[in-house]
A protein has these predicted regions:
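Secondary-structure boundary/capping residues
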Residues: 8-11, 59, 294, 389
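Basic, short loop/linker segments at the boundary and entry of helix-turn-helix/winged-helix-like folds
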Residues: 1-33, 38
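Anion-binding and metal-coordination hotspots
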Residues: 39-52, 63-418
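Helical catalytic core of nucleic-acid polymerases
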Residues: 7, 17-21, 25, 50-62, ...
């Protein structure tokens, strides 16, 4: 019913003049959403489900789009999914199921459609490049030998040389991308390094004393031997996952309305940690329609904490509740019932947030994070079974992460509507 209320004109226009009768976008979209909401993600499994499952036959209007049609539709219209998410939230608001206020933010590592064993490190690429060049030189010398040494049966020198030269070209391309990433990283680290130097110098001038502590370490230019690129999905990154070990992943971010548990915005990034993800999410939240209400507070764990993030929330007129340190396992039993001293006049945004987190209301709101955004991520991964992206590339996985969020929201709306 919700899909029938969505404005799909942009999708419909894309099919005009195709020459052959096509499945209606609403049918294909419904099939995909129902699949992601019930743990059926692959296009071949979706096609088979339209034959085997009564529920899928109903959703697909007893039609049977093949896997190629479903997969092409999914890839083609990924950019439109985020707009459809907003439409669904507006429908939920009209049904009085959501009104923005307090939002919780969290991130989770989602496996990429690539094996970590397909990764090539910069150090290994140098060794492999040297080895292949030596092999090519030996093969060329063998080809030019005047005594026409006998070759092993089935061995073709041109083919062997061409195969190694192809690998050398692929390695050179991979090295160039690693070097480009290293240059970008160096520029960012150099800017941070210079800012720290300027801060030390300014403080020294203010106090008239030499700077205390060790000076910041200057960044190193160029790639490190351990810098790597994945040859299957070069935009994915090696990340540490819960339970131990490392996998080829993306970092999927979700912002959840704390009352309805509906996902209001998502983001997918290549960074392992969450510290740089507050400001991008604030920009996304700012694009939500006024009809949904205004985000009043943003709740996040200590992985998101930095002074810059707290100040960014203040500039957006959003109250931050970001843990500044991990919670103690055995806190003082009186702490929960003791109000903090009054906040001093002229307190900074960070000091105001620290004070807020010690108040009864602040503690209660922050505690809700554990029963809002964390369960949503848990359900997406453990109940819906979405633990790995099917698509490759940052732009594509962002669209697929939106599709997951859209499926979750429709599933959640069904529960909220009773």
């Amino acid at each position: 019913d919700v899909v029938e209320q969505l404005d799909l004109k942009e999708m419909e226009r894309a099919y005009r003049g195709a020459g052959t009768e096509a499945f209606h976008p609403a049918l294909l979209l419904s099939t995909l959403i129902y699949g992601y909401a019930t743990g059926v993600f692959g296009s071949r499994k979706l096609e088979r489900a339209t034959y085997d499952s009564v529920a899928f036959r109903y959703v697909a209007a007893n039609e049977h789009p093949d896997h190629d049609t479903l997969n092409t539709f999914r890839k083609r219209f990924l950019p439109q999914i985020e707009g459809l998410m907003v439409q669904v939230l507006l429908i939920a608001q009209a049904m009085k199921l959501v009104s923005l206020g307090n939002v919780a933010l969290d991130g989770t590592k989602v496996k990429a459609n690539a094996s970590r064993h397909s990764a090539l490190s910069y150090g290994h690429s140098l060794k492999l490049e040297q080895q292949l060049r030596e092999e090519v030189a030996r093969l060329l010398a063998l080809a030019e030998a005047t005594d026409n040494e006998a070759l092993p049966d089935g061995m073709s020198l041109p083919e062997e040389i061409a195969r190694r030269e192809d690998r050398l070209s692929a390695i050179a391309a991979a090295k160039a991308k690693i070097e480009a990433r290293a240059n970008e990283r160096f520029e960012q680290e150099q800017a941070v390094y210079q800012a720290k130097l300027n801060q030390r110098e300014a403080k020294s001038k203010e106090t008239g004393k030499p700077p205390r502590g060790q000076p910041p370490t200057p960044p190193q230019a160029g790639p490190a031997d351990k810098d790597q690129i994945n040859l299957t999905d070069e935009e994915s990154r090696i990340m540490k996952v819960s339970g131990g070990g490392f996998e080829q992943c993306y970092n999927g971010q979700i912002a959840v309305d704390m009352d309805s548990l509906l996902i209001v915005k998502t983001n997918t990034v290549q960074a392992c940690n969450d510290k740089q993800q507050i400001e991008p999410m604030l920009k996304k939240l700012d694009t939500l329609p006024d009809a949904l209400g205004k985000v009043s507070a943003l709740v996040a764990d200590t992985g998101f904490y930095s002074e810059a993030n707290v100040n960014a929330c203040a500039r957006s007129e959003i109250t931050p509740l970001i843990a500044v340190s991990r919670e103690e396992h055995h806190p003082d039993p009186l702490a929960r019932f003791t109000a903090p001293p009054p906040l001093e006049a002229g307190a900074t945004a960070v000091e105001a947030m620290r004070h807020r987190l010690k108040t009864k209301d602040g503690r209660a709101l922050y505690a809700k994070r554990k029963c809002t955004v964390e369960p949503v991520i848990g359900i997406v991964k453990s109940v819906l079974g979405f633990r790995q992206f099917l698509l490759r590339g940052l732009e594509n996985v962002q669209g697929e992460w939106n599709l997951v969020a859209l499926a979750w929201n429709l599933k959640r709306m069904h529960v909220l509507a009773g």
